[in-house]
Amino acid sequence: MTLQQQIIKALGAKPQINAEEEIRRSIDFLKSYLQTYPFIKSLVLGISGGQDSTLAGKLCQMAINELRQKTGNESLQFIAVRLPYGVQADEQDCQDAIAFIQPDRVLTVNIKGAVLASEQALREAGIELSDFVRGNEKARERMKAQYSIAGMTSGVVVGTDHAAEAITGFFTKYGDGGTDINPLYRLNKRQGKQLLAALGCPEHLYKKAPTADLEDDRPSLPDEVALGVTYDNIDDYLEGKNVPEQVARTIENWYLKTEHKRRPPITVFDDFWKK
């Protein structure tokens, strides 16, 4: 088995999908989890205005709607969380995403004050954060807020990780990667677009250039620039297609060096890191 085949198998990626079937699969997955653990009353998700959180948010709200209708349990809710750092450049996209999702509840937590306070406390301890590390601080502050909200609403935190993100480890460890349940896991980027199109999402929310937008020195840096490969390249690779050798090498290097991000903390029983 080639490394490409191993990666595809590990991430559960498929070369083709039926959008309606995958929508139903994710909704039923979320409903099944909530029904298995009836003490869970809320799904909590940060909404950025990008493709992934828009899709995950819509699926969460659909799952909650169906479960409320089936059980009559009005205490179930989906909580969409806006987590800007100061003023977000694409705030209108966030509002458009929320209008599309129609969440039960919307909370806004501006993380800038908390991030600056943490940075100052570290500075006083003799640690000056680089712009890149400050970006990770933002991602972790966002997740901290979501877990606080989940803790106070008997909820779980929903993630947006999918195959095209997992393969490169393009997420912050214990930031946006630190979630409870990931309904998009298995899909690549273009497949996520297919689901949103089937759901009637405004096109500009899934045709915009994806960006983590964590660095102050490089605001709205496109993911594809940071990664050195395009999402079309990554999607082709995950669909088992032949890609240029340099593209395959770049993707595989990302996969191998970020393996620790896709695993629990390393213990004496692990040996994957010895390769």
From Swiss-Prot:
Asked if the record carries the keyword DNA repair, the reply is: no
Q: Which domain of life is it from?
A: Bacteria
| Listed InterPro entries | NAD/GMP_synthase, NAD_synthase, NH(3)-dep_NAD(+)_synth, Rossmann-like_a/b/a_fold
- One GO cellular component term noted in the UniProt record for this chain: cytoplasm
Give me the reactions it catalyses: deamido-NAD(+) + NH4(+) + ATP = AMP + diphosphate + NAD(+) + H(+)
Tell me, what is one Gene Ontology molecular-function annotation carried by this entry?
A: glutaminase activity
Keyword list (alphabetical) reads:
ATP-binding, Ligase, Magnesium, Metal-binding, NAD, Nucleotide-binding
The catalytic activity of this protein is classed by the Enzyme Commission as 6.3.1.5
What pathway annotation does it carry?
A: Cofactor biosynthesis; NAD(+) biosynthesis; NAD(+) from deamido-NAD(+) (ammonia route): step 1/1
A Pfam cross-reference name? NAD_synthase
Q: Where does deamido-NAD(+) bind?
A: R140, K173, D180, H260, K261
Which top-level enzyme class is recorded in the Swiss-Prot or TrEMBL entry?
A: ligase
The residues the record assigns to binding Mg(2+) are D52, E165
Q: Which residues bind ATP?
A: G46, I47, S48, G49, G50, Q51, D52, S53, T160, K189, T211
Which Gene Ontology BP terms does the record give? NAD biosynthetic process
For whether the record's keyword set contains NAD, the answer is yes
The entry describes its oligomerization and partners as: Homodimer.
Report the sequence similarity comment from the record.
Belongs to the NAD synthetase family.
Q: What is this protein for, i.e. what is its function?
A: Catalyzes the ATP-dependent amidation of deamido-NAD to form NAD. Uses ammonia as a nitrogen source.
In Swiss-Prot or TrEMBL terms, this protein is called NH(3)-dependent NAD(+) synthetase
Species this chain originates from: Escherichia coli O127:H6 (strain E2348/69 / EPEC)
Question: Which classification does the entry list for the species?
Answer: Bacteria, Pseudomonadati, Pseudomonadota, Gammaproteobacteria, Enterobacterales
